[in-house]
Amino acid sequence: MMYHIPGVLSPQDVARFREQLEQAEWVDGRVTTGAQGAQVKNNQQVDTRSTLYAALQNEVLNAVNQHALFFAAALPRTLSTPLFNRYQNNETYGFHVDGAVRSHPQNGWMRTDLSATLFLSDPQSYDGGELVVNDTFGQHRVKLPAGDLVLYPSSSLHCVTPVTRGVRVASFMWIQSMIRDDKKRAMLFELDKNIQSLKSRYGENEEILSLLNLYHNLLREWSEI
């Protein structure tokens, strides 16, 4: 399943990020890609050795960790270190699949269950640059407002179309979920959303408490901690 997570960063935060990224040192994006991805990747990434990068990636981690909808949809166990990329002048990233595991500075290794892209450019400021994701439900083309994030299964083939005008800047990361199975995670998310909707409409009652009990027992049964 694919999820749109709005408002991860405020417009003020996005403007500040963009101003700081204008001063960043950018390197060939293939430095973080395996052999298969390097054949189809043509973009730039912020140098991960810079002080600016360290500060910005911490801000992204804090923002997603504090976003209730992100947590409900991803049920994250481990987040990768966020990276930042830039596309311009017809740069693109052809169809590829993300690696199943990635190294992690604290945990050694993590499984990539979900991929996330946090858009940092106004969609009207560039042409092209759509994230195209192929999954079991068909093909999805994604171009979100700056500050919004998209979550999708890391097992999906995906690409970024050529940017023919302007500049597309984004942050991206991977998530190991407490729930490995996409279908089970999607069921828990739908159950959680409906519980929250019922609570806002009717307040606390025995039926909602029963549904909460069901949610947490399923999470207990399926989670890998």
From Swiss-Prot:
Domain Fe2OG dioxygenase: 78-177
Residue sites binding 2-oxoglutarate per the record: 168
Keyword entries, A-Z: Dioxygenase, Iron, Metal-binding, Oxidoreductase, Vitamin C
Binding annotation for Fe cation: 96, 98, 158
Biological process terms in GO annotation: DNA damage response; intracellular iron ion homeostasis
SUPFAM superfamilies: Clavaminate synthase-like
GO MF term list: 2-oxoglutarate-dependent dioxygenase activity; iron ion binding; L-ascorbic acid binding
EC number: 1.14.11.-
Keyword field contains Metal-binding: yes
CC cofactor: Fe(2+); L-ascorbate
Organism, scientific name: Shigella boydii serotype 4 (strain Sb227)
Keyword field contains Oxidoreductase: yes
Pfam families (alphabetical): 2OG-FeII_Oxy_3, PKHD_C
Source organism, top-level taxon: Bacteria
Cofactor note: Binds 1 Fe(2+) ion per subunit.
Name of the protein: PKHD-type hydroxylase YbiX
